[in-house]
Amino acid sequence: MFYSFCKVGQYMTYFKFELIHRSKKSRARVGRIHTPHGIIDTPNFVAVGTNGTVKALNNTMLHDIGLQLMFCNTYHMMLQPGTDIVRQAGGLHSFIQRKLPIITDSGGFQVFSLAYGSVADELKSRGTKKQGGCVLKITEEGVLFRSYRDGSKVLLTPESSIKAQKDLGADIIIPFDELPPYHIARDALKKSLDRTHRWEKRSLEAHLKNPQEQAMYAVVHGGIDPDLRKESCAILTELPFDGFAVGGSMGKTKDEMHTLLSLTLPLLPEDKPNHLLGIGDLPSIERSVPLGIDTFDSSYPTRAARHGILLTKQGPLNITKSEYATNFNSIEKGCLCPACHHFSLAYIHHLFKARELTCMSLATVHNLYFMVQLMEKYRKQIQEDLI
Amino acid sequence: MFYSFCKVGQYMTYFKFELIHRSKKSRARVGRIHTPHGIIDTPNFVAVGTNGTVKALNNTMLHDIGLQLMFCNTYHMMLQPGTDIVRQAGGLHSFIQRKLPIITDSGGFQVFSLAYGSVADELKSRGTKKQGGCVLKITEEGVLFRSYRDGSKVLLTPESSIKAQKDLGADIIIPFDELPPYHIARDALKKSLDRTHRWEKRSLEAHLKNPQEQAMYAVVHGGIDPDLRKESCAILTELPFDGFAVGGSMGKTKDEMHTLLSLTLPLLPEDKPNHLLGIGDLPSIERSVPLGIDTFDSSYPTRAARHGILLTKQGPLNITKSEYATNFNSIEKGCLCPACHHFSLAYIHHLFKARELTCMSLATVHNLYFMVQLMEKYRKQIQEDLI
């Protein structure tokens, strides 16, 4: 069992990573992340609850299906309701009534992706400035942007991001970083990376002044440049972070991502947990678990659910197809989720056709339970050295 | 205890109305309606689940809060998924997985309200033909209308409505009736009433050929004309219906409705349950319980919930108001609903502001639980002769 450092020589008791098994077949590993709000078995899937709820569910439902880690977005919580209010409520766990672990990001990703658009937007030339939010100025200090909610100017810096994340009080927090656009010259990428490292260091320093029983994961950047990725690992692993997230652009294809992760993961310390930011579609998880990724967050299963895509062991099915109108079986035989336990494909198909909100929660709870089960299966297979 | 007749001399064992207490102070009464899917304590509120679900909830949640009767709309179920499919699923209870009693209407109300608009639409001159559905022809046979879903022509007759309701298999069904517009000359109203009586009789005959453990409530019509209301009661109470619903236009104001109900209720048999169709706002319930109404259906509490109106003992509150942003109490102190048990006003306010679907289900489950509790309070007060 490895204990993470808070400061040199000072053992943390509230956060540790326990390595249970390392596969003989790959770099895949099974572990346990101990947090103030309980254990996260790894590898695991992290549900995205941007505004403090997974869309269409409530947090007691998440608890009941055993979803161990939930991702909330600091950017959104800053703008609504404001992190002050969450602090007054006693922190995010109390405000949203979640008893299990939470991770928050720095807000940087959202600010920059609103400015540049997502990588996918960029590749598809869908333009920028979604939702009307925009970056006004990037300086060494931080980023000045306009709130998409009320048009007010907001300055986000490493210190203000950490202040916000202290208000939120998640178990795992993320330093402030820059998300450079996918199409960027190497010089500009290098400059961005250097600044990100300075911002992450400032974030860590701000955090360590008041650890508040939170753990901080660094975010490895460097885009699709292998040398810069290596440099990022080298610099960040020198700092007393509690874990390491992999962020930034990872290329256009799953092959590119696989290559980058294969290069990056071995450069991260084995005794600390790692996280793959914003990627959690099924093929990516399948290819990344053998590389040693511990946790994945993604809105894929929940967003897919709201569009009628239900995950099953036989692959995703589109519940809106007419073939399900008279299928009175459950989504997946043997599935113990509340949707499968009570309702048929035909009924859920009907709810989608009738545009009833109820279908969203049934589909979402099924897909998340599927992810919980899938990750449990991966852990079992790793322990049996099958992965 | 009164037993309803199925045919003369043939006692029904699957449906009966049990009168528990008649108030000494008013015509209010406490009773129990026994159905194949359990008891409905009266007076009670009936939740509207148009498409086989209360919007934003699932049927296990309804069960858990003790909602004893749910109203599904035959018109909607005919067009989507089609009552054939529901029959194949084993009926509505099986299809939507509801273990407690269900009532369905005839489809007539929707067909005509799509043609004429609702009374409220009419009074506000909002015009007709909402959603693009329209009545093509009304004959003695029935109504030919165009489906708002696919533009196909559908003929709804007393016999086809009952056929559909046999497919659905609710505990309580409603004969096919005409909903005349509010602004109608007396002659036309009288003609409509006569036809409605013929249609209701045909519906009853169709039903009694195959009772299928269903009970049928007549629908008293006559609009705002006291003499026609009396005539309707006289004619319908001669027929072996199992209960009596009051339908049609009941005037522009609550006073008009009160006058009409005061006149109508004493003309209905005491040994059978009655129902007030489509009216269940709080002031109307408060004024109608003393008149002896047993059940009320209304989409008010659920629709209000989706607009952020939460019902409390101190009156409705608008959760979207900024005063709730930092109110960390539950919606109502002591309320045992899932929303109050877990979440604060501030969090639900936040979910509304962030436009999260989750707020809809929390608000809806609270409002319905409020109605369950309210009706229980009324029953208690009647038993103590306070109403």
Swiss-Prot record, chains A, B:
Keyword Glycosyltransferase attributed: yes
Its EC number(s): 2.4.2.29
Binding site for Zn(2+): 335, 337, 340, 366
Enzyme superclass (EC): transferase
Catalyzed reactions per annotation: 7-aminomethyl-7-carbaguanine + guanosine(34) in tRNA = 7-aminomethyl-7-carbaguanosine(34) in tRNA + guanine
Binding annotation for substrate: 105-109, 177, 248
Names of required cofactors: Zn(2+)
Active-site residue numbers: 105 (proton acceptor), 297 (nucleophile)
Annotated keywords: Glycosyltransferase, Metal-binding, Queuosine biosynthesis, Transferase, tRNA processing, Zinc
UniProt family annotation: Belongs to the queuine tRNA-ribosyltransferase family.
HAMAP family membership: Q_tRNA_Tgt (MF_00168)
Protein purpose: Catalyzes the base-exchange of a guanine (G) residue with the queuine precursor 7-aminomethyl-7-deazaguanine (PreQ1) at position 34 (anticodon wobble position) in tRNAs with GU(N) anticodons (tRNA-Asp, -Asn, -His and -Tyr). Catalysis occurs through a double-displacement mechanism. The nucleophile active site attacks the C1' of nucleotide 34 to detach the guanine base from the RNA, forming a covalent enzyme-RNA intermediate. The proton acceptor active site deprotonates the incoming PreQ1, allowing a nucleophilic attack on the C1' of the ribose to form the product.
Name of protein: Queuine tRNA-ribosyltransferase
Lineage summary: Bacteria, Pseudomonadati, Chlamydiota, Chlamydiia, Parachlamydiales
Gene: tgt
